[in-house]
Every structure is written in structure tokens, then in C-alpha cells.
């Protein structure tokens, strides 16, 4: 790839690793907007539970690819790719450099590596049927039909399980057989965060989510879209729903959310290790090291 090609900086790492704070600092130094690559932050009204950049942070630095749809309008990976790629290319035409930030490894890979997701539109009727069956049945179904895809999806992750089954039934092809086309003509610099104190950071983040009003946000979403909304089965929202229903105390909800988040972070780390090759930034002087690497690639 020619060094004259535009530079795309991707900042990746597990949840609660400090991506947002570092992204804001990098964006400020380079006078760049931030492109979101977090799959749950694509949805409006889901702010606290997804740790979406606050209004103050978004006022400080422009953000793109946030709040694309309401939670009852699922965005497929292919749709995200079709929306995001032109936006990034438009920014590259202006500055020749762009900053992507997120913990959704598959979404990052789709953008930077030319991964071609299956062209299967959301199927509301099928999703209703799968929701009625329950995740205890759906995940084993996926394991039997597409074990490679199932191995990458947590048994409790109803959203991704349903999408994999949707692709399987809609196309006749397993999700794991996604094709790869030529990657875009970008130079990609991957910067990774993996702090040693991640467990502590996750616990602090979880407690903060509940203090900030996660339960109230979940209540509003449940009233507007129904408690069976697939996104309300994801980490944090699921436990908040159980609190609302009276089956969990606050202490229990925080503990379970923190535990599930740690498990999710472990899967993220595994994905980044297998699918990406980032420059892992140290826990100290992180911004300094990041800017040194970026400046080397901008020369």
C-alpha cells in the first residue's frame, strides 16, 4: 500500500479501558472528529448503559456514527459498513487522517479489512419467534448449525445469537462463512488499550452506571419498546430490568453486571489478540506514546 494513502487511526480495547478519554485527547491534539465503532452506541436513548460519550464530551469534540437509529430498528453489520465507510472517506478527503474508536472488534474489522457481511435484512417475525423460544434454546440451535459462529458469541448474548440465526435462515449460509473483499485504500494504525487494573476499572464503571441512572433509563426503554427488546437483554440493561421486576437487589445487579462485563472484556481481548495487531499502549504516558506513533505515521 502506498504511503500516500490516507491514515486511519483505530483505538481499540476492552470495555472500561479508557478509550473515550484517550480518544478525546488525541482528537483534540489533531483537531479531528471521533468516529464511533461501538455497536450499542449506534442507538438513540441508550446513553448510560452503553457509556456513550456525554453531551459535554460531544460538545468538546464532534462525534460521528452515534445515535443512528432507535433501539427497535436493528442495524446490521452490512448497514453499518454502508453508512460508516462513506462518512470516513469524506473525512479523509478533507484531512487525510481519521480516528475510529470502539470495542466492537467485528465492526472495526469490517471497516478496515474489507470484511463482507451477509446481505440479510432484519426479520422481525423471526426475531419474535426466537425471543419466544428463549436464549437457552437459541444458542444451542446456533451451536448445532454454525459452531464457529456460536463459539464467538456468549451464551447469554441474545442479540448476536439471533442475528447469526437470522443470517443462517435468511441466506442458507452460516455467519462464519463471511467473504472478504479487498480492504479500503487506507493505511491503518491500530492503537490498543489493555490496562493492568481493568478489573478495578470495570467495577468502578459498573457502579457509576447505576449511580448515573441506568435503572431509570432501562425503565424508559422498557415502557417505550417493551421489555422483550433484544438490546435490553444485553449487559447492564438485563440486570436493571431484573431490578425493576424485583428479582435482583441493587447490590446483586451491580455484582452480576460487573461479572458479565469482565467476561465480555475477556472475549474482547481474545478477539483483539487473534484478529488485530495493535500497538499496545503502556498504562503510563499513554497519550505521549500514542502521539509519538501517530506522528511517525503522519510523516
UniProtKB/Swiss-Prot annotation:
One of its GO terms (biological process) is tRNA modification. InterPro entries: Dimethylallyltransferase, IPT, P-loop_NTPase. Keywords: ATP-binding, Magnesium, Nucleotide-binding, Transferase, tRNA processing. Its EC number is 2.5.1.75. One of its GO terms (molecular function) is ATP binding. Belongs to the IPP transferase family. HAMAP family: IPP_trans. Catalyzes the transfer of a dimethylallyl group onto the adenine at position 37 in tRNAs that read codons beginning with uridine, leading to the formation of N6-(dimethylallyl)adenosine (i(6)A). This is tRNA dimethylallyltransferase. It comes from Synechococcus sp. (strain CC9605).
